[in-house]
Amino acid sequence: MKTNREEILQSALQLFMSMNYESVSLQMIARSVGLTKTGIFNYYPSKLDLFIAVADRYLFHLQDPGNKFAPSDGSLRDFIDKYVEGVARTMDEIVRLGNIQREKMPGQLANAGYFHLFQQVLFYYPDGKHKLHEWMEKEFRLWCDVIGRSVGCGELREETDIQEAAALFRQVFIGLSYQMSFSDGLDVGILRKRFLYIYGLLKR
């Protein structure tokens, strides 16, 4: 059984994915979980505190590379498999949490609603721009590390530009995720196919 805190966070996530921050009230969240507004204050003293908790748990924690991807054997080929598996697992969790109120999502899709949450973090989360940059930079460095090792061990061509290759993988993922969020969500089969095409160009 979920604790009140978990219920509050999940209900708040659904509301912040489907509405702008300014439009969401603690009273709306309290009503959705069967608590009084005062009851929510026992967990979160303000709407901003609740929004920060939602972003920390369902964005920054869920998307952290250390939580999102299983360890690979060190090769880029295996990392691609682990990356796509981690993306699929995370996406399933987001859809599971968000689609409870699917009809209220922007475009009626949890995936589009999740991008909506990212945008709100940029504007309402304290120093959100810096925190988002740190998260993106962490994942970029992970790609650079894997590609660098793969060049060093001879898996990839020695003339591979490590940073450009890492940026290419990241931008394919971000671009495809955004484009497909307005239909049925990211197709991880297509993502894998695009990644393996890039891999084929880099492979020794």
Give residue ranges: language-model regions:
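Helix-turn-helix
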Residues: 7, 11, 15-61, 71-72
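Solvent-exposed, amphipathic alpha-helical segments
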Residues: 11-19, 65, 117-118, 168, ...
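Hydrophobic alpha-helical connector segments
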Residues: 53, 67-110, 166-169, 192
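C-terminal peripheral helix-coil segments that are non-catalytic and often amphipathic
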Residues: 85-97, 141, 145-153, 163, ...
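Helix-loop "lid/cap" segments that line or gate small-molecule binding pockets
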Residues: 85-91, 102-108, 114-126, 197-202
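Amphipathic alpha-helical packing segments from all-alpha helical-bundle domains
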Residues: 106-120, 126-153, 164
